[in-house]
Amino acid sequence: MKHCIKLENGIEILHSNKPKDRQYLWNTMMEFRVGSWMLENTDPKAKFILDCTWTQDQGDFTFNNASFEFKENRGALSSGYISLEVLNTTKCEPSGLLKSVNDQVNYFLMYFPVYRNYNGHNSDLMDTMLLFKTNELYHWVRNRDEITASNNNTQNSNALCYKVPARYITDCESFKELIIKQWHIPEYELKAIDIPTQLYGLFKDE
């Protein structure tokens, strides 16, 4: 059964009776921050509902009744590859992009914070967020002969992922055509968005 917390700013948080595991807290915090950023910077009158339930059958959040799945892909721009998970090999079930397709989630939103080291390596790259239509992204990946799915780690792998070259963001016309919106949002700007205390209470104590 889903319950709803209504915040003073109009944002709503859906949750289950059973608290979620603490390991999901960071991802949920980022989902809240990204949705809040979109609310402030794209449509202040929109209806933003964050889904913290166990089922999440309509993505991570809805924005004006459109559903969104959010994935943070840290280091993708500096490593050269965008990882798109499609199968949880531990549970033998669809996950990531494929689960979003099966759940008919409208949009797939990816955020790429850049790893930067002390001597300025990758200082020319910007933290980037890209918006895609879920179905279009999935079928594009499936139909590219040069892109194959592989285990995310050589040891203790728990997911099967497609690896899309990060250079496709600028160098591949068909991939560029999939991008509905592109924003350059510094990570510190997202981290500056406060997390409501009610959100922490939806997760188990450590």
Spans of features found by a protein language model:
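Nucleic-acid endonuclease domains
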Residues: 1-206
